C-alpha cells in the first residue's frame, strides 16, 4: 500500500513539472504583430498590495491573451534590470503593457484595484489592452 501511494505521488510530481515546462514555453513565445509584452517592475521590499498587483495582472493578461502575451516581473534592485528599465524609461514600481513602440501604464489601476476590486482590474486591463491591439 505504501508503495502504491509513493508511486502515485511520484507520478503527480512528474506531471506537475512537465506541465509547467510546457506552460512556460507557451507564455514566453508569442510572436507576430499582436504580440503583447507586460512588465511589472518592483523592488526587493514588497507589500501585500505589490504582490497582488503582480499576481492578478499576470493571471489576467496571460488569461485574456493566451499565446499573444508575455509577463515579466523585473526586480529594479538587480543590476541586470537596468537596460530594460532604461529602455522603457522606468525608475520605480510600474505595471506596463507594451506593443511595439506603444505603451500603456496600468500602475495606478493595478494598485487601486488589485486587492479591493480584482474584477474591476481585469475589466480595465481588457479595455486598455484591447485598445492597444486596435491601434
Predicted region positions:
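Solvent-exposed, acidic/flexible segments
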Residues: 34, 46-50, 54, 78, ...
Amino acid at each position: 500500500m505504501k508503495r502504491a501511494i509513493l508511486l502515485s505521488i511520484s507520478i503527480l510530481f512528474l506531471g506537475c513539472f512537465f506541465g509547467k515546462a510546457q506552460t512556460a514555453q507557451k507564455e514566453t513565445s508569442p510572436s507576430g504583430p499582436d504580440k503583447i509584452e507586460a512588465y511589472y517592475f518592483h523592488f526587493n521590499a514588497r507589500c501585500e498590495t505589490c504582490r497582488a498587483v503582480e499576481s492578478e495582472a499576470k493571471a489576467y493578461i496571460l488569461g485574456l491573451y493566451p499565446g499573444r502575451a508575455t509577463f515579466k516581473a523585473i526586480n529594479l534592485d538587480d543590476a541586470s534590470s537596468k537596460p530594460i528599465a532604461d529602455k522603457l524609461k522606468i525608475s520605480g514600481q510600474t505595471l506596463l503593457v507594451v506593443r511595439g513602440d506603444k505603451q500603456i501604464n496600468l500602475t495606478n489601476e493595478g494598485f487601486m484595484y488589485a486587492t479591493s476590486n480584482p474584477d474591476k482590474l481585469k475589466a480595465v486591463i481588457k479595455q486598455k489592452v484591447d485598445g492597444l491591439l486596435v491601434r
